[in-house]
Regions:
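Short glycine-rich His-centered loop
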Residues: 1-18
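Active-site-proximal helix/loop segments of hydrolytic enzymes
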Residues: 23-192
Length: 192
C-alpha cells in the first residue's frame, strides 16, 4: 500500500509558491506504483487524487485490505537527503502479547519485518549515492498498522526546494524503494 501523505485541505509542508508536500508525495507515489508494476509487484495507492484521508482511516484501510507492505511518502524540512522511518514502540514485547493489540501498538507483531523493509530500502538508497538517515519514531499511522510499515521522507538538496520535484532525483529514489521492496518481499511474507 503506497500512501502519499496529506491531501485535500491538508497541504502538508509548503515549500514556497505552489510547491506543496501533498503534490510532491502524490507524484512520487504514482511513480512508485508504476515502478513496482514494472517489476511485477502489484501495489495499491491509498489515494490517487487530491483528497483528504484522515490519519486513522489510512491505517484502517491498510489493515482492512491486509496490504503486504505499507509505505508512507513524505517531503519535509529541515535537512537534506532521504529519511527512512520505522515505528518505535515503547514496549513492543509487551504490546505483542495477548489476544488484542492496543491501537497505538498494532505494529508490534510486524516491527521486525518493518525494520527489514526499512534496512533494504536504506541500503538501496545508499547504493544510489544518496544521503540517508534511518530512524525509529513513535509516529502515526506506522504504530497503528498491522503489516510491515515504513515512511520515506524526502528533504531538498541544500537550499534548492525545487529539487523535491527533480525527475532524475525522484526516479532514483523510486527505483531504490522498489528494489528494496523486491529484495525483502519474499523474506517477510508480503502479499500485494
Amino acid at each position: 500500500m503506497i500512501d502519499p501523505s496529506h491531501g485535500g485541505y491538508d497541504k502538508g509542508a509548503n515549500f514556497g509558491g505552489k510547491l506543496l508536500e501533498k503534490d510532491v508525495t502524490l507524484k512520487l507515489a504514482r511513480e512508485l506504483h508504476k515502478e513496482l508494476d514494472d517489476l511485477g509487484i502489484p501495489s495499491r495507492m491509498l489515494r490517487d487524487s487530491d483528497v483528504d484521508v484522515p490519519m486513522e482511516r489510512r491505517a484502517e484501510i491498510t489493515n482492512e485490505q491486509r496490504a503486504g507492505i505499507y509505505i508512507a511518502l513524505h517531503a519535509g524540512l529541515p535537512g537534506h537527503g532521504v529519511r527512512v522511518y520505522t515505528s518505535l514502540l515503547a514496549n513492543p514485547q509487551q504490546a505483542a502479547t495477548g489476544r488484542f493489540l492496543p491501537w497505538e501498538s498494532a505494529q508490534a507483531a510486524a516491527l521486525d519485518r518493518s525494520k527489514a523493509v526499512g534496512q533494504a530500502v536504506t541500503s538501496e538508497l545508499r547504493k544510489k549515492g544518496m544521503t540517508v538517515a534511518a530512524l525509529g519514531l513513535p509516529i502515526r499511522p506506522l504504530n497503528n498498522i498491522i503489516v510491515p510499515a515504513i515512511a520515506v521522507e524526502l528533504a531538498p538538496e541544500g537550499d534548492d526546494l525545487q529539487s523535491l520535484e527533480s525527475s532524475k532525483r525522484n526516479a532514483g529514489i523510486v527505483a531504490a524503494i522498489a528494489m528494496g521492496i523486491a529484495q525483502v518481499r519474499g523474506q517477510i511474507g508480503a502479499r500485494p
